[in-house]
Amino acid sequence: MRAEQNILHQLIGRFAGKRMLAVGDLMLDEFVWGRVSRISPEAPVPVVNVTSETYYPGGAANVARNLREFTPDTALMGLAGADRAGRRLVELLETAGIRTEGVLQEDGASTIVKTRVIARHQQVVRVDRERKVALTTEQLARACGYLERAVEGVDGIVVADYGKGFLTQPLADEICRLARKHGKILAVDPHPHTSLVWRGATAIKPNRIEAFSAVGLPPADPVEPVCRDEALLEAARRLRHLWEAESLLVTLGEQGMLLFHGEAEPLHLSAHAQEVFDVSGAGDTAIAVFALGMSAGATPRQAAELANVASGIVVGKLGTATVTPTELRAALAVI
């Protein structure tokens, strides 16, 4: 066990030298913090007295934030509006040291904003402001042109599909083609409603619901032990055939993760979370750390172990959070 932990620590040390690119739907996460002291006389809802507001990059931009915690060479590609929210998002990214030359800012696009109202450490309500707009032919050409220029200078590509319209099958095909051509790690967090095929990716990381949805199977209740969950195993078998990915990592919430790789038996990794305050962004952390691990020379099992521990840390934080190398090392030390 000690030898394996030493290897994991060494892998974390290599993350800083990796060059990573995050691709996907961009959002601005707004958190409105306040106190609740009474119920509204107008409707049976709490009245929140606002004390502060904070903003974070969300969606694929949060994947980039997680990557940036470990490596200074992090870039992002996606679509944002040339509106106030878009300008705020780009400013936050640049302040964090994330390269934004791949962010397409368009006058006709509206930046997606997700507003969460928090009181007493609980989410009271979430308000989404979004308008899905498919990429134009010109925007697709610009995105592909950026990818063509950027891919040779990165070690890994991380795709986060939130189903908001930036990722289309032609763009997915180009990402897969370039990753194969240049021998780059390609890790994908898919969305159940887009039905995009990521054939030949290094790793795909759906959650349980996404795994069933992607192959057209009805969701089934979890089974213990996880490795005997026949419905999940069948969904995974079909996914591996559909996507031809080298590894499939299914995240299962409180059940942890299930890793499929090659001809080996599925590997179940138990969850490590001590307390769960907020699961938003846990998938972003998992795919970012898994991709970093693979880019640093980890085996799929080692990369999954790091991703699993990192996810257990981030769900213990409130808001769109990230994990630092120090936190990950500390968590590994007590496992």
Residues covered by each model-derived region:
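Short acidic, glycine-rich surface-loop motifs adjacent to enzyme active sites
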Residues: 153-166
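Conserved post-catalytic alpha-helical subdomain immediately downstream of the catalytic base
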Residues: 246-247, 272-331
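Conserved phosphate/ATP/ADP-binding segment of small-molecule kinases
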Residues: 164-266
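Substrate-binding N-lobe of the ribokinase-like
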Residues: 2-11, 41, 45-113, 331
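A short, aliphatic-rich alpha-helical micro-motif
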Residues: 15, 151-152, 198-199
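Conserved phosphate-binding/catalytic loop of the ribokinase/pfkB sugar-kinase fold
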Residues: 103-109, 116-151
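Structural motif
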Residues: 21-23, 126, 155-158, 187, ...
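Positively charged, low-complexity intrinsically disordered leader regions
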Residues: 1-37, 332
